[in-house]
């Protein structure tokens, strides 16, 4: 009887220790140390307020440029597309399997209005990301501010304005899978991770609102 009780106790202990551990960031506060830029710089902003995180970048004013070009007869460009990024260091061991889920709202997708899911972030010039516009999703690797690898998958979105999406990044120790609304968009094999930095970026006249994130260590 005693041996049976010990065996049952051991099974229960193993079950508890093998359970996935999750952390939910609801953005009621900056609990993970996200990099914020509360003022609107000439590149954009990243702000946590009222339970969401909002990332904005700036874009070329094509309408104003067209008017000035027509008036002057000289090709005139007003403004420029900017890149803006925010990140934190996730409560994960990236050497082991994990998944990250983000509930987001996107203002609009276009060829020059992009948003991205950043991970394996070491610093501003060294990171991986899944990024997409209205036509494609890319997996891109940056090393010392240079693109050293890129995989592209064409995608046709049902809507391109005011999108509500759920992004999911799944890593099993070798394979990275990126899902949008439970649909697998891109899979990358034999990819090892080293850094727990994770975040988002926008490019062009883009606004990305992150409502909630769930980090799960499997």
Pin down the residues of each PLM region.
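Bacterial Sec-dependent N-terminal signal peptides
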Residues: 1-22
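Extracellular carbohydrate-recognition regions
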Residues: 20-43
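Extracellular beta-strand elements of beta-rich domains used
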Residues: 27, 211-215
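Secretory/extracellular carbohydrate-interaction modules
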Residues: 60-143
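Short, aromatic/His-centered strand-loop micro-motif at the edge of beta-sheets
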Residues: 144-166
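Short strand-turn-strand beta-turns centered on an Asx-Gly dipeptide
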Residues: 179-183
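Flexible glycan-contacting loops in extracellular carbohydrate-active proteins
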Residues: 188-211
């Amino acid at each position: 009887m005693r041996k049976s009780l010990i065996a049952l106790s051991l099974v229960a202990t193993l079950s508890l220790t093998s359970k996935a551990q999750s952390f939910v960031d609801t953005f009621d506060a900056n609990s993970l140390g996200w990099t914020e830029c509360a003022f609107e710089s000439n590149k954009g902003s990243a702000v946590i307020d009222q339970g969401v995180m909002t990332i904005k970048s700036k874009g070329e004013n094509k309408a104003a440029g067209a008017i000035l070009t027509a008036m002057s007869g000289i090709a005139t460009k007003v403004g420029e597309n900017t890149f803006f990024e925010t990140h934190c260091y996730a409560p994960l061991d990236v050497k082991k399997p994990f998944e990250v889920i983000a509930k987001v709202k996107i203002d609009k997708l276009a060829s020059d209005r992009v948003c991205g899911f950043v991970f394996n972030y070491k610093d501003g010039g060294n990171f991986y990301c899944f990024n997409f516009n209205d036509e494609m999703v890319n997996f891109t690797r940056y090393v010392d501010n240079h693109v050293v690898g890129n995989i592209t998958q064409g995608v046709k979105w049902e809507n391109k304005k005011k999108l509500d999406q759920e992004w999911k990044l799944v890593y099993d120790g070798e394979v990275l899978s990126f899902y949008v609304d439970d649909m697998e968009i891109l899979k990358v094999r034999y990819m090892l991770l080293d850094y727990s930095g994770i975040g988002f970026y926008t490019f062009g006249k883009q606004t990305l609102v992150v409502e909630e994130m769930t980090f799960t260590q499997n």
